[in-house]
Structure formats: C-alpha cells, structure tokens
C-alpha cells in the first residue's frame, strides 16, 4: 500500500550514502564511522558500486526514471579525489544521469579541496552543501568540530570563485 502512493511517472530520488567522516562530531546520531588509515575503503566502494548497479538494474527493469541524486553521509568529501570521481562517475553511468537535480554534501571544511569541488562540478552537480553547523568558534569546539568559522568562509569563497557554484548551503 505504501508503494502505491509513489509517483513513479515523475521519477524518484536516489541517495548515495558515504557513512564515514574524518572525526565523529559529539552531536552526531548518524550511522557513520571515522575513516582512518585502517579503513578498508576499497571494500566499501566495491560494495557500494554493486548496490548502485543492482539498484539501477531494478530501476531500468521497472521503467523508473531518476528525478534527482543526492550524495550524503557521513561526509562524502572524506573520500579521496580518485574515490569520489570513481563513485560519482559509476553512479551516473549506471543510472544514465541524475535527472533534474544533483547535490553533494561537501560536509566539513577539513575534507574539502578545490580538486574535489572541481570533480563534483564536472560530474554535473549543481548544488553543494558545506554544512557550517555554526559560525561560533566556541560552539564548534563544544561539538567537536575541528575547523573555524574562517575555514567555513574560505570553503564557501573557494566554491563560489574557483568552481563557480551558485547554489551553496
């Protein structure tokens, strides 16, 4: 009965989860882990790509159209540049695009690089979310975020100037 209410003709939204972060924020309630040198990201990415492949196959078999794609986390930008490009290009290839809207959660300033922003933009993402949480240094410290308000502002400036993002959150 629940699936009877889904408007398949207008498409569906695809969520790609990267459940890893550089550190764990004290307020976080998400099912995510800290990426360390011992984290087997190759195994996670292989499993994620298999999940993407199977999901895309089902969508094609059922005639479903993708309306939007969102990559969230955790912190998707905890992926290395090559990993980020691999996952995004694979998903776009399997699903044949992203529909009308494509957003990537860029997460934390300590994981964002110009190269990652360029990869995200080159894959077609029109929106990124940098998630400042707060611009108060004391609050950032209390919740376990290791960046500063200036780091947030610098990332926003980089996204606007270097990569020409206009839809920032």
Report residues per predicted region.
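Local cysteine-cluster metal-coordination motifs and their immediate loop/turn environment
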Residues: 17-32
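Amphipathic repeat-derived elements
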Residues: 5, 11, 18, 152-161
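Structural motif
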Residues: 11-13, 25, 101
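N-terminal [4Fe-4S]-dependent radical SAM core
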Residues: 1-14, 62-63
């Amino acid at each position: 009965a629940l699936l009877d209410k889904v408007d398949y003709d207008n498409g569906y939204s695809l969520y790609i989860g990267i459940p890893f972060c550089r550190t764990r924020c004290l307020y976080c309630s998400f099912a995510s882990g800290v990426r360390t040198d011992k984290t087997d990201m190759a195994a996670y990415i292989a499993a994620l790509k298999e999940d993407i492949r199977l999901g895309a196959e089902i969508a094609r078999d059922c005639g479903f159209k993708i309306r939007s794609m969102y990559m969230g986390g955790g912190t998707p930008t905890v992926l290395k540049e090559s990993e980020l490009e691999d996952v995004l290009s694979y998903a776009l290839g399997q699903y044949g695009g992203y529909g009308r809207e494509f957003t990537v959660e860029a997460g934390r300033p300590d994981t964002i690089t110009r190269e990652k922003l360029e990869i995200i933009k080159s894959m077609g993402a029109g929106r990124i979310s940098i998630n400042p949480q707060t611009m108060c240094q004391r609050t950032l410290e209390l919740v376990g975020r290791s960046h500063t308000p200036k780091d947030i502002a610098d990332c926003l400036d980089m996204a606007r100037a270097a990569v020409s993002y206009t839809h920032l959150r």
